[in-house]
A protein has these predicted regions:
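Acidic/His metal-coordination segments adjacent to aromatic residues that form catalytic metal sites
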Residues: 59-61, 106-112, 192-195
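An amphipathic alpha-helical core segment
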Residues: 166-220, 227-237
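All-alpha RGS (Regulator of G-protein Signaling) helical domain and cognate RGS-like helical scaffolds
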Residues: 75, 81, 86-96, 100-182, ...
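N-terminal export signals
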Residues: 7-29
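C-terminal segment of N-terminal export signals and the immediately downstream linker at the start
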Residues: 23-60
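Mature N-terminal segment immediately following signal peptide/propeptide cleavage
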Residues: 46-82
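Low-complexity, Gly/Ser/Thr/Pro-rich intrinsically disordered linker/tail segments
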Residues: 234-238, 242, 246-247
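Secretory targeting signals
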Residues: 1-3, 7
């Protein structure tokens, strides 16, 4: 029997990650919301840990399906953490640092493991933010100071959404689109693979994962369907908190 592309990718997604832990090392001193609904997992085998989701796997439906969330969190994110821990075992002092601080200055990382730490550490950092950037009942538009900043930079929230969507659609292959602070100014940026804006001296506020594993089971290759659906679960409260903290 011929396997469809969707079936093949599903098989790859299930096999591609190795489940480790549902705990996590603090991300820039922040923890996800307490009471996360993901089940406990075995103790981690290194200093970096996968954060538990702050909501149930199916909590973002109908926009993001349960199966995608389960595989994305328990397999893909866990695989990034496993490989990151294997790499930092070769330079143990990195295990005493926050992943954000490592990514801000990768010259501190031994050249032999630098590429691995950049890729796997970026995957861990990006996804640890990503889970918190979404919530059940999310979406809508930002409020308060962030809303004013968005309007001042882009014209309106609608204009921001149009530009952000275009940037996310324009990511070639796998990567992310971000709303960032570059200094004290808002900007929309792309990063390839698991690169993070933090490595370029910018503060990520909001990011959408446009790797196919983030949407293929539900949307197949239709990234144009995934992006507007994802905007319905954005946790603007979390994004605003990051904005306020970064602006001081």
């Amino acid at each position: 029997m011929t396997m469809t592309r969707r079936q093949a990718i599903k098989t790859t997604l299930l096999a591609g990650g190795v489940l480790t832990s549902s705990g996590f090392r603090n991300l820039q001193g922040q923890s996800p919301s307490p009471g996360g609904a993901t089940p406990p997992a075995p103790a981690p085998t290194g200093p970096f840990k996968v954060p538990p989701l702050p909501y149930a796997y199916d909590a973002l439906e109908p926009y993001i399906d349960k199966e995608t969330m389960t595989i994305h969190h328990d397999k893909h994110h866990a695989a990034y953490v496993k490989k990151l821990n294997e790499a930092v075992a070769q330079q143990p002092e990195l295990g005493q640092m926050e992943i954000a601080d490592i990514l801000k200055d990768l010259t501190k990382v031994n050249e032999a493991i630098r590429k691995t730490v950049r890729n796997q550490g970026g995957g861990h950092y990006n996804h640890s933010l990503f889970w918190q950037m979404m919530k059940p009942g999310g979406g809508g538009a930002p409020q308060g100071d962030l809303a004013k900043a968005v309007a001042g930079k882009f014209g309106s929230y609608g204009d921001f959404k149009t530009k952000f969507t275009a940037e996310a659609m324009g990511v070639f292959g796998s990567g992310w689109a971000w709303l960032v602070l570059n200094g004290k100014e808002l900007a929309i940026e792309q990063t390839p693979n698991q690169d993070s804006p933090i490595s370029q001296g910018m503060t990520p506020l909001l990011g959408i994962d446009v790797w196919e594993h983030a949407y293929y089971l539900k949307n197949q290759n239709r990234r144009a369907d995934y992006i507007p659906a994802w905007l319905n679960v954005v946790n603007w409260d979390f994004v605003s908190e990051r904005y306020q903290k970064a602006m001081g």
